Amino acid sequence: MGVTYVEGVLTGPTGKHATVRFWVDSGATYTLVPHDVSKTLDLAPKRTVAFTLADGTTIERAVSECHLALPEGEGHTPVILGEAGDEALLGVVTLEIFGLILHPFERTLEPMRMLLA
């Protein structure tokens, strides 16, 4: 199993932006923005959500939203506001919003087959 990273540019509500190297995690629901980046972008918490980790433990994190530009497209997405030690993750909600999938063998982002149903 390989690890895939992609670089993206996040823009906050005040127009500040930051370039982030995301680990593409097809097992993560939401995209996670590291603590220092969320502070730089002035991202404000909109709600708190409980997340279950791979080991079964549950943590709570604040969720916000911001604009994300990837080489494959751009748009708004919900993001988890990370805490110290949290790594930048690109989750499946963002991938679906952008109409992308992680190719399991090539380890690349590719357009997904979109359904209108």
Where are these regions (language model features)?
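Pepsin/retropepsin-fold aspartyl endopeptidases
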Residues: 1-117
